[in-house]
Amino acid sequence: MKTQFAILMIAVVLMQMLVQTEGGILGKIWEGVKSLIGKRGLKKLDQLDDTFDSDLSDADVKLLREMFK
């Protein structure tokens, strides 16, 4: 029982160390990938920018007013 508890505590400590350093390790890996691909390859990485069009045309406003009457 004592051995299992000791192994559990060592595993918890090692997991905490991994979680604390994970951001640094993954950040360095991501920087390496970005430098390999270059800025041009990562320029349009987020495709959701096209879906959020903040400009509403007059026809859009008219349709919204009709819908919410």
From Swiss-Prot:
Propeptide feature ranges: 41-69
Entry GO terms, CC: extracellular region; membrane; other organism cell membrane
Record's protein name: Amphipathic peptide OcyC2
GO annotation terms (biological process): defense response to fungus; killing of cells of another organism
Entry keyword annotation includes ATP-binding: no
Protein keywords: Amidation, Antimicrobial, Cleavage on pair of basic residues, Fungicide, Membrane, Secreted, Signal, Target cell membrane, Target membrane
Subcellular location(s) of the protein: Secreted; Target cell membrane
Expressing tissues: Expressed by the venom gland.
Ion transport in keyword set: no
Isoleucine amide, modified sites: I37
Described purpose of this protein according to its UniProt entry: Amphipathic peptide with antimicrobial activity. Shows antifungal activity with MIC values ranging from 25 to 200 uM. Does not show antifungal activity against Candida glabrata (ATCC90030) and Candida parapsilosis (ATCC22019) (MIC>400 uM).
Signal peptide: 1-23
Similarity annotation: Belongs to the non-disulfide-bridged peptide (NDBP) superfamily. Short antimicrobial peptide (group 4) family.
